[in-house]
Amino acid sequence: MRVIERFYFSTVGHIKAIFLKKTLDKSIKIEGFALKMMTFFKEAFQVNRKSYPERVRSALFHAIKKTAANLDACVKVPGKDFSRKRKLPLQTMLLMLIGMGGGSLSKELYDWFGYTPSTATASAFVQQRNKIRSKAVEMIFNDFVSSAMPTMTFRGYRLFAVDGSDLRLPSDPTNDFSLIRNAEGQKQYNLAHLNAMFDLMSKAYVDVTMQGKKGMNEHKALISMIDRSNIPGKVIVLMDRGYESFNNIAHLQEKKWNFIIRAKESYGMISNLQLPNSEEFDVDTTLTLTRRQTKETLALLSAYPERYRWIQPHTTFDYIAPKDPKMYDLRFRVVRFRISGGCYETVYTNLDSETFPIGKIKELYRLRWGIETSFRELKYTIGLSCLHGKKTDFLLQEVLKMLYTQTVLAFARKTTAGVWTFFWTYLM
């Protein structure tokens, strides 16, 4: 945060110096220059001393204070953990977990306490940290994002991408959550899978779920992020073909969210659909799902395979119970378009065809690549590929801390870009 503040105030100083020189060189009336400067800072920075770093810091402190007040939801043993007055109360611990740098724990503690004799020990910090549920940091992250993230839209829609990425963890043979056991004689290792929902317009993460690699299920992770979201307004979610499923589309449909999902080309939902034999097309489709195997449904399945689909008992579909006789309709478009290299891509979407014709669908789906770029930055620039904790809760705390860092940087870029755009177009 101090780095952002220094950047902000140094930037303001440079702007003043540049314009002072320009004013003197061109003999511009000082009154006119002062008026422009006042207008610039009022519009670009909202000069009521509520600068960008201050707004971010205020949002973060509010989120931490709000979370710490809900003590029972934050600790592993309610009524016992953090019940006594200590050097490291819950609010201080939450601040430190998010604000500490990459130095050794002892150095970070000395920096935090100002090298005073009352500095808490590393052992005390670890003991206190072990009492905190990872949900506490998750609550802070969600509250911070919802209050500080600028709402940026594409034609009035929030634009999200969902994807997953593997994380190599410090070796820990006792951690069943992430341990991967290879064939006898080969070295074991620890691997987790990060599932994320990424705002493509603000370049910030809005939700994450971490799973052990051996038990990962991207479909469950997606559904949990959809169902628990309280984001208002119109939303478009972009996903790769790994997320194609009846259940995922049904959850998006029930949420009244729009989607663009890349289709599997030779199998999956696209099989048995009646589609044009052309290079590009846009077809409205309705699939009716059932778990019944009565004479009536079997006749429908046989006569209209492009419309009716039978869901097997072991297949997950949350809107028809195993013996429920009802049917469920999925409505979407099947859109095929040309991409680079003479190749073609097919996607499913429930966006309106008049507002979003083939060209717009192609443009939107191409934006999905933003989450891949963000994963690379998160791992290799911010340091997500170099996690230190071994316990599952500690790991998730570190992941959320780095997501917070990435989110702050994303907000800073957006704010700075807007400032400089205004700077060059309005003042120069």
What are these regions (language model features)?
Residues R2-G103, E108-D111, T116-A120, F125-I132, ...:
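Single, function-defining residue in the core of a domain
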Residues A136-T151:
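Short Lys/Arg-enriched helix C-cap and helix-to-coil transition segments
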Residues R158-F160:
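Conserved beta-strand elements of the Class I
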Residues L179-I180:
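Short, positively charged patches
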